[in-house]
């Protein structure tokens, strides 16, 4: 069996149906003897360019291991599902199980200190002004 990475972009009006879609696709992979190695719901994000005058989409990333018949069935389902704006299927050499950079960035943002917990900011007025480059003595030489 081969390893694949799949990213689907779902219409933002259909965001509440995403868990059911993902469940249907993962059960299809499991029924075909495959395995889901990674499943990440990136949520609603702004797209790089509009598709059919839509500027946001709900993103889902899956890394799976399955046979060619199962991936053909998935791609057929993606093509005829009107809720899916775009899909990308990439064949990988190995199973990818670590957290994606997008999800890692989101978790870093959630862990970052906010408000009162954040360290104090250095204000520019606190800097010593004694290293001023202007010489007051040279201006009187005229």
UniProtKB/Swiss-Prot annotation:
One Gene Ontology biological process: translation
Protein source organism: Hahella chejuensis (strain KCTC 2396)
Biased amino acid composition, Basic and acidic residues: 105-124
Biased composition (Acidic residues): 125-142
Gene3D superfamilies: 3.30.70.60
InterPro entries: Ribosomal_bS6, Ribosomal_bS6_sf, Ribosomal_S6_plastid/chlpt, Transl_elong_EF1B/ribsomal_bS6
Tagged with keyword Ribonucleoprotein: yes
Entry GO CC: cytosolic small ribosomal subunit
Name of protein: Small ribosomal subunit protein bS6
Record keyword Repressor present: no
Keywords: Ribonucleoprotein, Ribosomal protein, RNA-binding, rRNA-binding
Superkingdom of origin: Bacteria
Region ranges (Disordered): 103-142
């Amino acid at each position: 069996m081969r390893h694949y990475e799949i990213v689907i972009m779902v219409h933002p009006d259909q965001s509440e149906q995403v868990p059911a879609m993902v469940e249907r696709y993962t059960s299809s992979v499991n029924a075909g003897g495959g395995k889901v190695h990674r499943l990440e719901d990136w949520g609603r994000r702004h797209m790089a360019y509009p598709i059919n005058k839509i500027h946001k989409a709900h993103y889902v990333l899956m890394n799976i291991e399955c046979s060619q018949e199962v991936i053909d069935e998935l791609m057929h389902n993606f093509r005829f599902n009107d809720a899916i704006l775009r899909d990308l299927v990439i064949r990988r050499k190995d199973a990818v199980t670590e957290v994606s950079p997008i999800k890692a960035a989101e978790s870093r943002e959630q862990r970052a200190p906010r408000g009162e917990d954040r360290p104090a900011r250095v204000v520019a007025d606190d800097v010593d002004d004694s290293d001023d480059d202007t010489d007051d003595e040279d201006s009187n030489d005229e």
